[in-house]
A protein has these predicted regions:
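Conserved acidic donor-binding segment of nucleotide-sugar-dependent glycosyltransferases
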Residues: 79, 97, 110-119, 127-133
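A conserved mid-protein helix/loop that constitutes part of the nucleotide-sugar donor-binding site
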Residues: 1-8
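Conserved donor-nucleotide binding/catalytic region of nucleotide-linked donor-dependent transferases
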Residues: 103, 126-144, 169-173
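Short loop/turn segments at beta->alpha junctions
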Residues: 25, 45-46, 78, 117, ...
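Nucleotide-activated donor-binding/catalytic signature segment of Leloir-type glycosyltransferases, i.e.
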Residues: 10-22, 27-59
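A charged, aromatic-enriched C-terminal amphipathic alpha-helix characteristic of glycosyltransferases
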Residues: 116-119, 132-164
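Nucleotide-sugar-dependent
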Residues: 48-52, 60-86, 92-104
Length: 177
C-alpha cells in the first residue's frame, strides 16, 4: 500500500520509492516486495549498517496489518525496532489500525506520524514528507519518549523499583492478616 501510494505522488521533493531491508529468505515474502510499485527491495544489511541507513533516510516506516487475524495476533505487542527508531532514527511513520498497541503508543505520545486508515495514506504521506518542521517535531518527541521509556540505564531501575513495591505491598498485606 505504501509503495503504491508513494509511487503515485507527483511532488518532485517527495521520494517516490521506499528502500526495504530484510534478512528474510522466504520467497513468499520477498517476491511480492520485488514486484510492488514504489518498493526497492535491498535485502539484508548488517546490524552496524542499520543506524547509518536510518541516519541517511528521510523517514523510517513501521507498519501493522489491517487484516483482522493479524490484528488479533499483534494487538498487545510493540516491536523492539520501534524503540530503536525512536532513539536513533529519523521521523517515524506508523501505518496501521488503531487498537494495536504499537500504533496507539506512538499516536498517544506524538512520537510518530500515524496514519491509521488506508483512505488517508496518500494524503498523509504527502503531508509528512513535505513538512520538514513536522518531521523535526516528531523526532524531538520520539527522542524524549525513548529517553523516558526505552533507556537501558533507567529501565532496570524502574523494574526493580516496581518489583520492590509489589514485594513490600505483599509483605504489608501478609503482616496485617
Amino acid at each position: 500500500d505504501i509503495g503504491k501510494a508513494l509511487s503515485e505522488l507527483r511532488d518532485e521533493n517527495v521520494p517516490n520509492v521506499i528502500d526495504v531491508y530484510s534478512g528474510t529468505r522466504e520467497f513468499d515474502c520477498i517476491e511480492p516486495l520485488k514486484k510492488a510499485p514504489g518498493i526497492n527491495f535491498c535485502g539484508e544489511i548488517s546490524a552496524e549498517s542499520v543506524l547509518e541507513v536510518m541516519a541517511n533516510s528521510m523517514a523510517v516506516i513501521h507498519t501493522e496489518s489491517f487484516e483482522q487475524e493479524m490484528m488479533e495476533l499483534v494487538r498487545f505487542s510493540v516491536s523492539t525496532k520501534i524503540a530503536e527508531s525512536l532513539m536513533y532514527g529519523p521521523c517515524l511513520i506508523a501505518y496501521g489500525p488503531e487498537g494495536i498497541a504499537s500504533i496507539d503508543y506512538l499516536k498517544e505520545n506524538n512520537a510518530a506520524y500515524v496514519i491509521s486508515r488506508p483512505e488517508d495514506l496518500e494524503k498523509g504521506l504527502e503531508e509528512i514528507l513535505t513538512n520538514k518542521e513536522l518531521r523535526e517535531q516528531i523526532v524531538r518527541n520520539a527522542r524524549a519518549l525513548a529517553l523516558k521509556n526505552h533507556n537501558a540505564d533507567v529501565n532496570p531501575r524502574k523494574v526493580r523499583k516496581w518489583l520492590q513495591e509489589v514485594v513490600d505491598k505483599s509483605q504489608n498485606e501478609n503482616s496485617t492478616n
